[in-house]
């Protein structure tokens, strides 16, 4: 038991480090493009930032299921180690050149890196907690929290490294990928291999599952919101000194000191993690379907809160703080969608064979939505700056609410077990 706990702790820690590195890399891309724009090197802009983000998500989309199948047919540990090493190569490439083709190659390789880690890791965690639903629920919660912690620290790490080391920051982030690869090699052992036909059978079963098909379009909308806000476009808009539409409070807010943007990301991620933790304690009583509805609906007043602050103009700081605190409380509520959707998906998955293949669906849904969100962020960011991100979020939240009508209120049979 102690060995298993140590193995799980080491592997989840490696996931946190990978998320720090991935988040830091995305933020560094935005900061690097701002530098190139200021130096009049190339034609970098919000559209470029959004397209680069989309290219990484596209690569993750294309490779998630094949690499999940590979993890079913081979030891997941070595698939994950290879993915972490590829991430180190990818992030190092970006800081070595001003060539846009290399930029896109770097982001594609980093997307493949994520695809080589996430489905195999989820499959490995499911295998290590086989037969113990309570342990699986705790471990999957820790997986989400390690992801959030990584995202929180990644923005801070990127801005601090950029402030002190500039282009060398990419090399330091690559070291993080190497450290994660070492931890995976040491701790992510175990997990048997499965015949290739079993892996493909598991994939076919998951793809045919009616609950998964009904959830997919709603989850795509929510993941597109993720792509809107976590791609390079937000960093570009907040830190670019040349942002037009100065009537918007958030445009170029941290142009003079980009390191402040990292602290904002840290605060937001900690707030999000607090919300996820709270939902894990009440989700069983609220119900999975109702939790998804509540979370989607809450996105609308959250956007209203950001809009009011963005256009507060000469309003007092007390007004901004009041709106900001109310918006923060609403963000706690909207965080319930991810644990609810994961519980829904967990109840639909067929655990007998092909865990990596089935878990690849999670990454595919994330990637497809995030691609659309990142492209939407670049387009709307060029048109409306920060307001464009709010507009995109409102449109996606409304679409998600409409699509929820297709999802039955009764959750899949196993969902309730995973959240106890």
Describe the residue ranges of each PLM region:
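Central cavity-lining transmembrane alpha-helices of secondary-active solute carriers
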Residues: 51-68, 266-278
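Cytoplasmic helix-loop-helix junction between adjacent transmembrane helices
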Residues: 106-145
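Helix-loop boundary and gating motifs at the non-cytosolic
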Residues: 2-57, 213-214, 218, 223-248
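Symmetry-related core transmembrane helices of the 12-TM Major Facilitator Superfamily/SLC fold
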Residues: 168-185, 389-405
